[in-house]
Amino acid sequence: MNLNFMISKDVLQGPWAGLPVAWKKDLSFDEEAYRSDVARTCAAGVPGVYTAGTTGEFYAMEFDEWKTIARVTVDECRCAGTPVMIGVTSTYALGAARRAAFAAELGADAIQVALPYWMDIDDRMIIPFFQEVTEACPGMALSIYETRRTKKTLTLEQHRAVFDCTGSYLAVKSNEGTLGCSPKGCEQLSEFVNVWVGEDNWNALGPYGAIGSASALVYMNPRVILKMFDLLSRKQWNELQPLTDQVKRLIEQGLRPFAARGFTDTGFDRLMGKASRFLTMNVNSRGTYPSATDEDVFALQKWMQENTPELLLL
């Protein structure tokens, strides 16, 4: 594997912006609005941008749409000089490998991939899967999207085996219920890969090595979230705590009415980005899952003005 041009582990740190896709009213791709929001996010100074995660609705687009959106994302990030990662998750290994090869062709810096999620993955399939995907994009950094939605969470030994066999595994997005979201697991993983957790966990897991996030909050308020990462980097835990508390309050209280209505990742994340007026794209997301509305944006704005006003100050 040729790793001569692979980005360093240090690049995959901080709040990488996992942007939603801009859709028109008819739910076709709104390239103009999307380019504008990617460019604005890059200009805000984020350490990196990625697309085709859950917020980016990789599961709700055709392969040709995915290719167009990936190309546009890389194009805008290259113009801005911002590192870029493309999500390549698929229901089958060849699908992920084809996406990884296309991301390499575009010149992306990294790929993010979860295990295939339709049928259960046997432990014996894990290493061959990551080998097949990374062999399709030699020289590109790998970030694992670890989530219980795939019906399989990795052990420390499996993470280490992926690290050893690929030579490109640099970061893991650790979600609730996975190894990196516990203090001990975060500390163990941080010995060889960067661990990303939600900003609401930075104060709890930063002391154990957490060093970034797959962030929806950074395009809600880049000023606050980049300040939080600076405090995390300098291990200023007392100063970080009040900001972490605001983020937790927003997630646990401000978003509660929308969770009760069945919102999922992209619904929440569009809503927050629109509430602060940082994102310009339409708030609509594709079904089957509930989509936020303009009325929802106004409702969250009102709640934030009363409860977390600093998060609205761009």
What is the role of each PLM region?
Residues 41, 103, 205, 273-276:
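Hydrophobic alpha-helix position signal
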Residues 10-13, 215, 219, 263:
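Alpha-helix N-cap/helix-start motif at coil-to-helix transitions, marked by capping-box chemistry
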Residues 34, 66, 70, 96, ...:
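A general structural signal for well-ordered alpha-helical segments in protein cores
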Residues 2-151, 288-289:
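Active-site beta->alpha loop and helix N-cap motifs at the rims of alpha/beta catalytic domains
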Residues 132, 136-138, 147-258:
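Catalytic alpha/beta core domains of metabolic enzymes, predominantly
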Residues 2-4, 16-20, 44, 224-314:
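C-terminal alpha-helical cap/extension of soluble enzyme domains
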